[in-house]
Amino acid sequence: MLRGKLVIQIEWRFNRPIQRACIWASLLLMFLSSGARVADVKAETLKAWDDYLAAANAQMQQRMSAAHPFLLADEDPAHAAKLRNGEILVFPAAQHIPKRVPSGLIHDWYGEVFIPDVTLLHVVQVLRGYERYKDVFKPVVVDSRIITSSESQDQFYMLLVNESLISKTALDIDYRSSYFRLGDRRGYKISQSTRIQELAGYGTDHQRMLPPDQGTGLIWRAFDITRFEERDGGTYIEVEEIVLSRDIPASLRWIVDPIVRRVSRGSVTTSLRQIRDAARLAPRRGEQSAECGRCFIGPTCVVVTPPRLPSDSFSSGEYMPPSAHWRRLR
């Protein structure tokens, strides 16, 4: 009876969808005491992470081939019909997610949405508008800004904060996003964390930044592949979110595992819904941004006149596998 009551109380608090990876931090904090042992990332954990990303890269390369469907929705007409009817579809990448690796967990989820009457340009405007992330993805993203930007590659910063029942979790994160263009109406991006640091005692007089790869091990790495295609009177978005975290103690898995899966699904759903809402409000061709008086395509505002995706939004160069990106940045 006590066990069932505990699960009900926990599920009541976390029934509200929360944005992206920060949710796993708050979930684990509920079960780890404030005196929990520091969990530094181990070499074998990173090796398992790199191997997993290599497999994700192989799947990505398959979808670049004309012999394979670019979107998962292309494999099932009923699936695509649900998206066009306004559903947001979210599901784990495999049956046993999160996947256990040496001293860690890999969380891997797919999410799909179709946004009618929105072009690929509008979606890119939202995704490259990093200064607006704190508005688009609130309340979890409390600060965001661009660090550097080029034609097809951006580095940006986010501060993620989430309050659990017993603690406030804060993660100070740098990301790198690379955009790739596949014709006028199709493209994809690869995003990965290049630095994740916990802010211990966030919001108190004792707040301090922990070194990278040190701390509670709630989130060690984050990575995503996002595909876009404009057709059928709108734009399809398909994202694969992959996160590496500390393992859950065996004695607590019966509590935490189902909650992590349920809330992970909700957080990806919320993320796609927020992108959809923001894309619907993006400046249309010929309209102007109220902030700077011009339309914008990314971190640097430019005048948008053609109805096709501008050449400065995606790279037309050679595709670099995610594993190569990660080895260079780690």
Could you say what each language-model-derived stretch is?
Residues 1-19:
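N-terminal secretory signal peptides that target proteins for export/translocation
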Residues 290-330:
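Extracellular/cell-surface secretome signature
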Residues 13-14, 23, 74, 293-296, ...:
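Secreted/luminal cysteine- and crosslink-motif detector
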Residues 39-289:
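Eukaryotic helix-grip
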Residues 20-33:
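Bacterial N-terminal signal peptides
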